[in-house]
UniProtKB/Swiss-Prot annotation:
Name under which the protein is recorded: Tubulin beta-1 chain
Positions bound to GTP: 7, 76, 80-82, 142, 164
Cellular localisation: Cytoplasm, Cytoskeleton
Family: Belongs to the tubulin family.
Coiled coil region boundaries: none
Ranges of biased composition (kind: Acidic residues): 367-386
Source species of the chain: Avena sativa
Gene3D superfamilies: Helix hairpin bin, Tubulin/FtsZ, C-terminal domain, Tubulin/FtsZ, GTPase domain
Amino acid sequence: AVLMDLEPGTMDSVRTGPYGQIFRPDNFVFGQSGAGNNWAKGHYTEGAELIDSVLDVVRKEAENCDCLQGFQVCHSLGGGTGSGMGTLLISKIREEYPDRMMLTFSVFPSPKVSDTVVEPYNATLSVHQLVENADECMVLDNEALYDICFRTLKLTTPSFGDLNHLISATMSGVTCCLRFPGQLNSDLRKLAVNLIPFPRLHFFMVGFAPLTSRGSQQYRALTVPELTQQMWDSKNMMCAADPRHGRYLTASAMFRGKMSTKEVDEQMINVQNKNSSYFVEWIPNNVKSSVCDIPPTGLSMASTFIGNSTSIQEMFRRVSEQFTAMFRRKAFLHWYTGEGMDEMEFTEAESNMNDLVSEYQQYQDATADEEGEYEDEEEDLQAEDM
């Protein structure tokens, strides 16, 4: 892993924490100034100064791989460093390794809890980058993670450690097939092929099962139907969007542990038959399952869920509304223009995000018999473009 930040504080706490010894000391790359929750500082000024030393470390790590699958980037979209410098790093890695997978775990600003007032700006500018440069984005949200800890895991005061634990379970689940043997293998590229019907629509909801409160683990029977039921449960989605408000374009289920692949397939078909109205009918067989033999430590079975649902537009729509409310009055814009940004960039990011929302809406409303019409329209558009 390579850890980067524009201020030394968080790095020091990682280094002195319980896991400080597992990271190579050279892989901590940090600046001194901080980004002050300013996307422009992370992307254009402070971040741009630090990015070359980060890329050197990334290059060293990549050269150590015998078969580099891709990159996983964890960042938040509300602050300055994760959003501004995170997207800068993604675009630089994209330039250098154009054919490797780029997977991001992006923490969106929460609906009710706001850390800083300029979150909508930072998030919108980041989404603008992620649409173009990332292959797969797992959309996370602190509030949804907090709800899972509170409601399902029965933690009265969840800490960031508890929230991170959920994210790490998902990260581990997504990559387990690369790291362990399995009956039905999948990797990041297969995942992308199966989950992304249109290149721009690569923002996924993630879920994990079994989620059990610490006290009641030993009373819980782990069966494939139980895992299936829990991982499709909308309460366990790690972002503030409700899959019942949209339809699944595609989904993927990754099971871990000793189990029969036949049973997994039966359960997946069962889910699709019972909830057929929540799946678009013009993509047949749109749920992919994979099975990996080695379960996570302390569990006999586990499953990770990744869904490409049109309801993710709720997240974008919410951020976009907040963005517009501020941008209309040009609030706080001088922080960004002062770092050399142009208002035009904001306008572009805003329209890109709104386009994304309307694309999701278009495919949510599409039916099988309309598909031909869209193709005709697209051909007309292409003819016009020529």
